[in-house]
Design a protein with these regions (language model features):
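Surface-exposed binding/hinge segments that line
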Residues: 72, 116-166
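Ligand-site clamp/hinge motif
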Residues: 204-250, 292, 380, 389-391, ...
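N-terminal lobe/hinge region of extracytoplasmic solute-binding protein
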Residues: 25-75, 105, 182-184
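Gly/Pro-rich hinge or "lid" segments in bacterial periplasmic/extracellular proteins
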Residues: 62, 151-211, 216, 342-343, ...
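Aromatic- and charge-enriched surface segment that lines or borders ligand/interaction sites
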Residues: 69-113, 127, 131-133, 138, ...
């Protein structure tokens, strides 16, 4: 069930625009430096400055070469990639096809959460040191998009540092690759003090040309919204993201700040357990979410425009589908938000055998997305008008 699309906003101190060092703050810290361990937005965003994929998105979300220079279909299920020559990892080790094969085997290990990005790929074959064949179990139209987040590690470095296996983050395992990096990317992570700061410096030996003038980055996670904004206004940091929507208008009018904003490709949605026969935190006789009428009633009860206006302060877009504008496959015809219909929702619940409504628990993060807990609480209040009684279980993510 889709709710809305985020519109990201970042504020920068005007004095930082010519600086070589960028002091950046956001709400969350990374979870690990292991690029295959945790599918977490902040972690992926930062770690991908050190590690690179075979292909990457440009600023318009179009696929362009990265560690692969070209690719072509050999047959409907096989894509041949030519790899970039004369690329070295940060420790000086040359990049070859062996590193791609190793990374493919590694990312699929069950203790990680990044397997989705090589989903459908059956095998990667080495043709020579700079040519590989990626073989899928069936035609795979999303292969290149997924490979944007399939980051390549050095086989030699992982073997040397006993990091052939992905860190078991859930078991609180600490490995060398979880606290150190060795990629081919534009920045070298020099230091990470969890929940305090992360320091990066430009990789002078990078195969590509660095965009912009930033040679050093100091990233500081600041959970408190007021503290993060105060750090920006005082000059302790140069840029902040994850801004509270209620403060955006005020900050826009601050002469010493510049704003960068635009739509994200993230869609916020509610996921329901449709697989279990009965719910852990709901009616014990049956799983109400298996009935499409219940799910439709829940969707019809949500006023997406009210969330956009009152909670997100017009920094979101109502959504009806999971695919965001700008992403391949988006359809404006399908993304038409239907008006809220409380009476229609009540009728659907009655038809489904629940004239007195339904009850369940809604798990919701309170530190991952902008206004995440507030959005969940608003949805619960909207549901209540249709007889849908949900208990909010807000929790920290990570």
């Amino acid at each position: 069930m889709t709710v809305g699309l985020g519109v990201s906003a970042a504020f920068l101190s005007m004095s930082s625009l010519q600086a070589a060092e960028l002091k950046w703050a956001a709400q969350n810290d990374i979870l690990t430096l292991d690029p295959h361990a945790q599918n977490h937005a902040t972690t992926n965003n930062i770690v991908s400055h050190a590690y690179e994929p075979l292909v990457r998105f440009d600023k318009n979300y179009q696929i362009q070469p990265a560690l692969a220079t070209s690719w072509k279909n050999i047959n409907p299920t096989t894509v041949r990639f030519k790899l970039r020559k004369n690329v070295r990892f940060h420790d000086g080790t040359p990049f070859t096809a062996e590193d791609v094969l190793f990374s493919f085997d590694r990312i699929r290990q069950p203790q990680g959460t990044m397997q989705i990005y090589v989903g459908g790929v059956k095998e990667i074959k080495k043709i020579d040191n700079f040519t590989i064949d990626v073989i899928s179990d069936k035609p795979n139209p999303t292969l290149l998009n997924n490979f944007n987040t399939f980051l390549i590690m050095s086989k030699a470095w992982c073997v040397k540092n006993k990091s052939e296996k992905i860190q078991d983050y859930k078991a609180k395992e600490i490995t060398y690759a979880a606290t150190n990096t060795n990629g081919t990317g534009p920045y070298i992570i020099k230091e990470w003090q969890p929940d305090q700061k992360l320091v990066m410096t430009a990789n002078k030996a990078w195969w590509d040309k660095l965009q912009g003038n930033v040679t050093d980055v100091v990233y500081t996670p600041i959970k408190s919204d007021p503290t993060r904004i105060a750090a920006l206004l005082s000059g302790n940091v140069d840029a902040v993201t994850d801004l509270p929507t209620q403060d955006v208008a005020r900050l826009r009018n601050t002469p010493s700040l510049a704003v960068l904003d635009g739509p994200e490709v993230r869609t916020i949605f509610l996921a329901m357990d449709q697989g279990s026969e009965e719910l852990k935190y709901g009616p014990k006789d049956k799983n109400i979410f298996k009935d499409v009428r219940v799910r439709k009633a829940m969707s019809m009860s949500i006023d997406r425009v009210a969330i956009q206006r009152s909670i997100m302060r017009d920094l979101s877009l109502p959504a009806s589908i999971l695919v965001a504008p700008g992403v391949n496959g988006y359809s404006a015809d399908l993304d038409k938000v239907q008006p809220t219909d409380i009476e229609g929702a009540k009728k659907l619940l009655t038809d489904a055998g629940y004239p007195n409504g339904v009850e369940f628990t809604l798990d919701c993060p309170n530190n991952r997305y902008v206004n995440d807990e507030e959005v969940c609480q608003a949805i619960i209040n909207m549901w209540a008008k249709a007889g849908i009684k949900a208990k909010l279980n807000a929790m920290n993510f990570g």
